[in-house]
Amino acid sequence: MTKGILGRKIGMTQVFAENGELIPVTVIEATPNVVLQKKTTETDGYNAIQLGFEDKREKLANKPEQGHVAKASTAPKRFIREIRDADVDGLEVGQEVKVEVFAAGETVDVTGISKGKGFQGAIKRHGQSRGPMSHGSRYHRRPGSMGPVAPNRVFKGKKLAGRMGGDQITIQNLEIVQVDVERNLLLIKGNVPGAKKSLVVVQGAVKASK
């Protein structure tokens, strides 16, 4: 069984461990989430809970949305996400999920949308090496070989210039350094994907070392 919560990335800071070690942490604000729906193997083919995060104005929600959240006796939500393989029996529709479901020392997987970088070349986008910049070379930052003559086409998957960033990224096995229940904050060791104020999903690690 896994557990999870939705939150917003606030930024990064540093905290000191008891042994004096300086730990870089990402601060995530996870105000109480509301369980909007429970999905079970019998009705949906899999187990999951649907969480709603951050209220939005009533007039921004259509009729189906309003009816959906009314079953949980809550306001329409800006973000709705599913947590797969959650403890369906231990939660009820309308119940709040808070940061205290996690504890310091646990490992989690954090999912977010990476920062958009716009249209970038093969060097920045794929880490390709550039060519010589002088001595008569005319190959500097180009993508390189497009393949042999015979196929008369460029193979799918060729690493070329294009839009970079804005992808869903999951970083696994990050350690929770501190849980601030009063301020609804999670301090997670290291960096997590996304810009400041972006939505992140924090779930129990699926590959945690036992």
UniProtKB/Swiss-Prot annotation:
Residues 119-151 are annotated as: Disordered. InterPro entries: Ribosomal_uL3, Ribosomal_uL3_bac/org-type, Ribosomal_uL3_CS, Transl_B-barrel_sf. One of its GO terms (molecular function) is rRNA binding. One of its GO terms (cellular component) is cytosolic large ribosomal subunit. Keywords: Ribonucleoprotein, Ribosomal protein, RNA-binding, rRNA-binding. SUPFAM superfamilies: Translation proteins. Transmembrane segments: none annotated. Coiled coil: none annotated. GO terms for biological process: translation. Pfam families: Ribosomal_L3. Gene3D superfamilies: 3.30.160.810, Translation factors. Part of the 50S ribosomal subunit. Forms a cluster with proteins L14 and L19. Belongs to the universal ribosomal protein uL3 family. One of the primary rRNA binding proteins, it binds directly near the 3'-end of the 23S rRNA, where it nucleates assembly of the 50S subunit. This is Large ribosomal subunit protein uL3.
